[in-house]
Amino acid sequence: MSDVVINPGREKGEPHLPDAGLLCVNPGDAAQAVSLAKERQGLRHFLFNSNLFQIPAADQEKPYFMAGPAVGAPMAVLTLEKLVALGGRRIIVYGWCGSLHDTVRIGDVVLPTWAVSSEGTSAHYPLNVRPESHSDTRQALKDLLIDGGLTVHTGPVWSTDAPYRESRDQVKQFGAQGIFGVDMEYGALVAAAAFRKVELTAVLLVSDELWSGTWKPGFRSKLFRKKSSSILHLLADFCAG
């Protein structure tokens, strides 16, 4: 490990987090997470320009944390680093992705394994092996989501810093290689988590389709928003289980 100038740490007065928690990438989901955390008597803490709530144990439920938003690889990893420094060890990331494959449709869920990284953050977390999401948690989440009536795909994704620069050739190439979706954060998050030796799993709701060469957005519909909220509640309950 290189001799870096700044290491993440817990400052005076900052909380000791439970080991399990949920990081919501998107602002809309993070806003719903704030409301849910308040309903569950969550204690709010400072976290950059994001939110952080510590949810206490209740009845048979374990304590956990909820954080977000954290859009883009640099902010997502900055947030992850702080969560790990505060005690997070088993982190579920909830976000959205675009579909690169004709079998993956709006409203489906992708559970990413590894990533093709075009973002600039993951390279700062060098590893000897390709990082992947935590397999046991990924399988448990797959079972949970399927039981909830969702269509689930497990496989690699492409992470990019520039969604407005995704070319048709790239979409076609990655789709042909079996890359299911494209997002902005996962490749960096899974690399940083492996570097810090913590467990990370991601759940990506398909918000739009790119595979045809014509962009098809789906995130504006009420049905999509309702499904996104439902998944958020499922994941919060999973963290408490």
Tell me what each language-model feature is:
Residues 89-90, 180, 199:
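Short acidic/polar active-site loop segments enriched in Thr and Asp
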Residues 140-148, 192, 234-241:
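Generic non-transmembrane alpha-helical segments
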Residues 128-177:
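Active-site rim beta-loop-alpha module in soluble metabolic enzymes
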Residues 1-139:
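Metabolite-binding pocket within alpha/beta catalytic cores that recognizes anionic/polar moieties
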Residues 41-47, 150-155, 241:
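Flexible, glycine/charged-enriched surface loops at secondary-structure junctions
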Residues 187-223:
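Zn-dependent metallopeptidase/amidohydrolase metal-coordination segment
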